[in-house]
Every structure is written in C-alpha cells, then in structure tokens.
Amino acid sequence: ISDEVHGLIIYPGKKHIPILCVSAAARAQSVQVTSMSKGFNLMALPHAIIAIADPSLREAWHKAADPFDFYYASNPFSVAAVTKVMDGSADQWLAGVTDYLQKNRNMAVSFLQREVPGMTVTVPEGSFLLWIDCSGLNLAHPAEFLLEKARVSVNDGAAFGNAYGQFIRVNFALTRQKLQEALERIRQALDEKA
C-alpha cells in the first residue's frame, strides 16, 4: 500500500513517481492511495482515490472493503470539488501554492540550519512537512519541550515509530509571518534552555 496523498506538491527539479508506474512487479502487488486533499486544500471534503492495476488484487480489495461501505463515505460536494481540480483548471493555483510552500520550506530550513545547530533538517523534495532530528538538542522529549516552552505545536516523531522519539515533524503550510514567529519562538526557547 502506497500512501501518495502528498504527491501533488513536488518542488521544481523533482518528480513524484506513483508506485503503479515503477515496474510491472510493483503494479502486480501494489495499492496506490491518494487524494486531492493535501495539494488542493480539500481536507474538509472527504474523499480518497484508490488505484489497483492488478485485477485479482482489485477483486480482493472490493471483497475486503465492501462491508465498510467506503463507496458512500464521500458526498456530492467532495465529488464535485475533486472532479473540478482533476480537470486541470486548478493547475495554476496549485503551482502558486507550491511556489509559496517552497519559499516557506527554504526559509524554515535556512533559519533552523543557521540559528538552531542542534537540529538536523531533512529537506523535503515535496509536501509541506519538515522532518527534523533533534538529538543534538539534549532534550528528553523535543515535541513536549517545544509545546511547553516555545508554544509551538509539532508532531512527535515517536508517533511514527519508537526509534523516532528525538524527531519532530513540522508543518510549514502557513503564512510566512506565522512561520517566522514560530521559528523565532523555537530559537528563543532553546536559547533560554542553554
């Protein structure tokens, strides 16, 4: 199962390759799950797109999914919105959003690399999330510290596996002013700790 919900937000020079396009072997054994929700900010309109190339795998999916009534989990507004953005008429809007997010990403990465040397930032090629290793900060629980001391809410890396307790995930899909304010508060809280 390949979750490709962030696949629409890809920065220049990079390319998203859906799992079903990787190889014949991948097509034969993969389920691609995606949505327009992240790229087009349609989180309030529930929907999902499930692509299964292999007929026997698709049949197994239908049998497994049938009792859950997934086909009726959406609504007419969701269907209309998804149909509209998939026709290409919102591509220019998505390009503008992607450009804005890239500038936010660059600003956040630059700030953290320059001002918070104990954080190691993985620079994303797409999406609007930073994955940050905080092991250089000497904090027992980085996400808790940032919430309590900096008043900045981040995702605790431990939610993604026990090995990631020293990591945080930061959403940078917000106004540049709010992002700058959050980054400054992180730096200030860490400066006061030192």
Q: What positions do the PLM features span?
A:
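Hydrophobic residues in well-ordered beta-strands that form the structural core
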Residues: 1-2, 154-156
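PLP-dependent enzyme catalytic core of the Aspartate aminotransferase-like
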Residues: 145-154, 160-194
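Conserved core segment of the aminotransferase class I/II
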Residues: 23-102, 110, 190
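Helix N-cap motif at beta-to-alpha junctions
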Residues: 54, 136-137, 175-177
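Short, conserved active-site loop motifs that form the nucleotide-linked donor/cofactor pocket
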Residues: 30, 119, 152
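Short hydrophobic/aromatic beta-strand micro-patches
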Residues: 51, 131-133, 171-173
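Conserved glycine-rich beta-strand-loop-beta hairpin in the small C-terminal domain of fold type I
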Residues: 83, 99-109, 120-133, 164
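Catalytic PLP-binding core of fold-type I/II PLP enzymes
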Residues: 1-15
